């Protein structure tokens, strides 16, 4: 009996080794292993190589686990049944004692295997998968060498089955931006990343999805010089709007000639020279980009052209607005470079906000914790969302209810939504419900 118990313990140890090996190899993170391999850890590289082709490894593990389970059942019955039978035979019939001994012996062996050969080693492997994998890789390589004939045989059968059912035989481990975002989110929840670091990484990915109109200065807010503008008017504009660059156009903003740098104008003032644009002022070529460009592509355009300022045009060659390198960096860095600028979203209290109509829809989603706006590809700003939902040029008091919020137009500037009042009306998302002012509302407002 003692020999049988020792055999059972050895089988449990072997099964625990295979269980721990299986879960540790599957749970080991490639990024961490690659860092260790780059530092010269040979075992880390061996684990990576085995992860690339895990078929032989898992075949050996399954052969080992199944063989141990069968042997455990055979030896376990022989180890404990006689002892239980001799104990119970004193108090009951031999037939009943034999049946009860078998049940208890089976339960004891099964419980020992579940606890010590499966649950415990697998939990250890899940807690520290890389550390365990580095320690078991060499013994597993020896097992692979010893069991090579069996591995070839069973792997060949498995490959035939995979080909018959046209199943993929290699795992795809391409890392996507969603995978990185999930890791970052987990790091933020665990407290590893600070709030600013988390937001910065989120903003990096937004550069790929947000187009230039979401961060531009719209055309109605662009300060530009007419080629034939008088000198006093130019001085007044520079004094009132101290920008570093000014567009130069011919009669209207859609006929761009170039731009002038404020430093050039300052040098002419210091030299007592005229500021008139047709009197020798250097007019530089303007970088022009389409409105379909993403912010990351705009950064690349700035780098290629050696500029920090660009005009955005649509498909009809009409100026949509302008964007600067600072606009892109403000989107990327958020409050770190945006301090001192006029806030587009102002919280009145915990349940209401005043939002500028030109605020990018992504910023509104972040502040209000809204997952997605309907058909957001059709607009870039919260004002565009209102026009899209109302299906008309909005007027004051027009409103839309969405995602538990009421979006109400409170100010219009030349047909453009200048400000919205957003009020939380419900903690749960609600269906889209545009509301237009009717006769009854007008009567009540007059009263």
Swiss-Prot record:
Organism, scientific name: Escherichia coli (strain K12)
MF annotations from Gene Ontology: flavin adenine dinucleotide binding
Domain of life: Bacteria
Observed phenotype of the null mutant: Deletion of the gene results in increased sensitivity to cadaverine and putrescine, but not to spermidine and spermine.
This protein's record includes keyword Transmembrane: yes
Cross-referenced Pfam families: CBS, CNNM, CorC_HlyC
GO cellular component, one term: plasma membrane
Ranges that cross the membrane: 5-25, 55-75, 100-120, 142-162
Protein name per UniProt: Polyamine export protein
Compartments, record wording: Cell inner membrane
Recorded topology in the membrane: Multi-pass membrane protein
Stored InterPro entries: CBS_dom, CBS_dom_sf, CNNM, FAD-bd_PCMH-like_sf, FAD-bd_PCMH_sub2, Ion_transp-like_CBS, Transptr-assoc_dom
Keywords for the protein's UniProt record, in alphabetical order: CBS domain, Cell inner membrane, Cell membrane, Membrane, Repeat, Transmembrane, Transmembrane helix, Transport
